[in-house]
Amino acid sequence: MAYDRPIDTWVFRSVMDKQPRMLTVALNKDLYTCYNLQSGNLYKVWKGGVNYEGAVYTTAHGIQPTSFGFAYVQDGSQQTQWRLRSGAGEEIPEINYLGYSFIDGQVGINLELISKTGKSVKIREIPEYALDEGRSGLVRSFTVLDGASNDLVPVLNYGTDQKLIYKEILKGGERDENGIGVQLSKNAVVKTYFNPVPADWAAPITDDTGMIANGKKIVEGSDCSACHLLKENLVGPAYDSIARRYPFDWATVDVLADKIRLGGTGNWGTTPMSAHPDLSRSDAQNMAYYILSLDAEPEPQERVVDIALNTPDVTFDLDNDDRRGGDNKDKQAGAAVSLYLVNDSGDLYEDLTKSTLPILNGIAPAIHLPTSGVLGEINEHFYMEFKGFIKSDETVNKTFRLISDDGSVLKLNGSEIIDNRGDHGAVAVDAKVGLEKGWNEFLLQFQQGGGGYGLSLQWSDDGKQFTVVPDSVFYHDASAFRKLLPYVAKKVSTVPGDQMPLNAVHPSFDMFQAKPSEFHPRIGGIDFIDKDKMVICTWDATGAVYILKNYNTEDPESIEVKQIAKGLAEPLGIKMVDGELYVLQKQELTKLVDTDGDEIIDEYQKVCDSWNVTSHYHEFAFGLVYKEGSFYATLATDLGSEFKEVKDRGKVVRISKDGSEVEVIAEGFRTPNGIAEGPDGALYVADNQGNWIPTSKIVRVEKGKFYGFKHADWERVKDYKEDPPLVWLPHVEISNSPSQPAILNIGPYKDQMIHGDVTHGGIKRVFIDEVDGVKQGAVFRFIQGLDAGINRTVWGPDGNLYAGGVGSGGNWRHEGRLWYALHRFKYNEKSTFEMLAVRAKSNGMEIEFTEPIASSEFMNIDAFEVQQYYYEATEDYGGPKLGVEGLKIKSVNLSSDRKKVFLEIDGIQENRVVYIHIKKPIKSDEDQSLWSTETWYTMTKKPVDRPGVVNP
C-alpha cells in the first residue's frame, strides 16, 4: 500500500520543542506525531509541521527544531504513560527504547517495559493516519512481541481533551473505568479521530527565536494596529486575510516587506499604506513572514543563498595610486572601487565618506567576491564603494540580487533599490527594476565588520535563474575616484608554508575526488564495508548514510552513490564491525540492519544511550573506534556556565558491543571532535579551544585522567588538576578546530599521526616524541588546498587516505571553501623535503629532515628563530600565549649525513610550547625547497642526560 507522506524524511530523530531524544513521524500533511523515547510517551499529535532550525538545517547555533500548528494531543511530562499490571497491583515500569523499523511502508516503534522484578514486556507500536467523515485520525496498532502474560499486562495511560475528540475506537483493548488507562491485549488497536481545527484558532508562537516569533514581536510593538487587526478589516486588511490571499514563499515575503517599508497602494483598495522608512528590511521581512504564517500554511524551505554560483572570484588589485586624472566624459571598462578603513566611531556609508577619505582604490571588472580574503591583508572593519555605470543596449527589466556578508546597499539612477544593511552572514536581497537604454549610474556600498566577508552582484531575467552581472556592462569615469590617504601595506611572507598556510596538496600524495561532482556530502563519518564499498554518514538536515561503490577509481563520475538510511540525528561516527553497521547519533549508538538484502536499512536498533543528555545544541557525540570488543566515543559539552552541573559531558567513553556497559575512560574535554587509535595502541582525541581550553590540542588518552574542561559536573571537578596534552595547537597559526586523528605510517613517516581541521582547513602532521615515559611531540603543516574543512580522516583497505569535509555557518567552516568534500590521497613515493621529526634534547632541539640539506647551504644561528611560551586554562573562551620569550641559539650543528640539525639552546623550560621557525630558505640535495618552515613542539617534560651533538 502506498502512503502519502508529507516529507521525504518522514521519520527522523532530533531534539524537538526543547526535549532530547525525540522521534518525529510525519504521517500525513494533516497529521504529525512525535514520541519521547526516554519516557516511551506519545508526546504530541498535531496538524502543522516542524520549524527546521539549528546548525544542520539553517546553520544557526543555539536553536533546535520546534513544532508548529494545532495540537490535538500533547503531553510534556517526563513520567511515562505506561504501566504494568499484575496480581500484585500496578507499577510504573522502567522504559527501554529498543529502536524502530520500517515495515511495508510504515514505521514500528519498539519499547521494553521492565518490571521491578526484572521481568519485561516488549511492545511494538505502528502509528498511522486515517480519515473518517473528513476528520483526521491517528491509528495506533500495538503488538506485544514478548513477555506479556496474565501476570504481567501492559497498560497505556493517557488523557485527551474530549472537546477535540470526534470518536475513539478500541480493538483488543479495554479502557479502565477512570477513562484514562487502556489495558492492551497481544494485538490492540486504538483509533482516535479528531474534530476539525477550531475556526477561531490562531497559530501559537512555539519558539522565541525564529522569524515568526520575531515578526510577531515587531508587529505587536509597532503602530500597525491602527490600520490592521488579526481577523477583522480596519483601514487595511486583516492579517489573516493577507495570509489566505498570498502564498507563503520567499518571493511574497520580499514583496510584502518592501510594501511595509515603502508604502503605497496595492490590491486592497485606494487607501495608501503608510511608509515605514526607519524600519530595517530584516524587521520588515520578519513581519511579513509572521503575517503569512497565520493561515498555518507550511513555512517555505530555507532560502538558498548561492553566493558563489560556481563562478570564480573576480579579483582585482587595490593600490594607493591617484586615479583622479583624465576626462570625466571618457568612460572606461570596469567599476571604480574605493576602500575605506572604518573609523573609531564605527561610521558607515555616507556618514563615513563625509568624514574621511579612502586609502586604496582600483578597478573591478565585475562585482563577485564570494571568497573571504581575496582582497589581501585587509579582511575586517572596512567599507568599500563600487561606483560607475551599467550599460544597457535596450530598455529592459532585470531582477538584481545583492548578496553580502556583512551589509550592503545598491543605488541605481539615484534611487536606493536594495537595502541589505546590517552585520550578518551571506544574505540575499532582490529587487526588480527597469534599466534604461544607455548609461545607468550605480553605487554599490559594502561594509565588512568582523569575521569572514563575501559580496556578489547578480541579475536575472525571470527572477529565478541568476548569474553574476558580467564585466561587459560595467564602466566608470575619473569622477568616481577620490583623493587617497597615505597607506603603507604590511610586509608579510608570500611563501605558502612560511608563517602562512600551505596552498597545495603534499607532493608525496596524489589527490583524487572520491565522489561524483553532483554529490555534496557533509561528512560526519567514513568507514569501509569491503574493498569495493565505502560507507559514510552525513552531518546535515537529512542525517543520512550512503554506500559509495567503485570509490577508488580515477573517474569520480563513475562512482555509484546509494542512500541506505536517513533521519538520523547529526551522526558523527560510523563503524563496520563483523559485517554489521553501527552509527553514532547525537544521543545514541545505533545499529543499522538491512533485513531483506537490498542494502536499504530496515531497522534502526538502539545499542546504547546510557548517558545524560539535554536539549542543548552542542551535545555532539563523536566517534567511532572499535577495539577489543568495545566501541569508544567522545561526548561534547554544553556551553555556558548555566550548564555546569550536566553530568556525562566532556567524556571519552567505552561502550560494550551489546550496549550493556558504558565506562568513562577520561574526562575534561570540551569539543572532542574525533577519536582514533594511535601507533602505540592508545586512544588519541582532538579537542577544540574554548572555555578552560586556551588553545586546541591533541590528547593521548590515559584512563582516569582529566584534561581541563570544568563546566561539566563543576562541583566535582572544579579543583581537578589538568593533565597535559600530546601537543598544543596554537590558535590560528596551525589550528582552529581540529578533527579526527589517524595513524601515518607510510614512506618516511613512521609511527606518526595526522588530523584534519574544520576551520583552519587541511591536514596536519604530528611527530610523537617520548621523554622519560612522557609522550609529547611536534606538529607540522602537511596538506592544504582542499575543497572544504576536513572533519574525518580514515585509511581505506586500498592503502589510500580518505578525507571528508564539512561546513556550516559562523566559524564552523574553512573560510572561502565549500561545505562538503570527499578526497582520496594516494601515496606516490615521491620525496618531499620537510622537517620529519623534532626531538627534545637536554641542551636544545634536534630537527630531522626527510632529505639531506644541500651541501651549498650554510646553516648558522641567523637561519632560525626559536620562542617558548605557555598557556593557562581559565573560564574565559580561549587564552593568549603567556610568557613569550625569544630563545638565544648558541650553536647550529649539522650531522654528517646533513639530515639532522641540532640547535644548542639554553633556557628551555618544561610545560612550554617551543616554536621553531626556519627563516632562511633552504634546499635539499635534490634541489627541493622546504615544504613548510615552522613547527610547534610541546615540551611537557625536558630530558635529562640526553644531549644533542655539538660539533667541535
Ranges and model annotations:
Residues M1-I126, A130-D132, G137, N157:
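Beta-strand-rich N-terminal accessory domains
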Residues P198-E220:
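Electrostatic cytochrome c docking/interface patches
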Residues V219-K231, M273, M287-I291, V545, ...:
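The canonical Cys-X-X-Cys-His
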Residues V305-T399, I403-H506:
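Extracellular/secretory pathway-exposed regions associated with glycan biology
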Residues E829-A837, A854, I918-P952:
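Acidic, Ser/Thr/Gly/Pro-rich low-complexity segments and short DxT(G/T)-type signature motifs
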Residues P852-S891, I916-K923, T933-Y937:
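Short, surface-exposed alpha-helix to beta-strand junction/turn motifs within ectodomains of secreted
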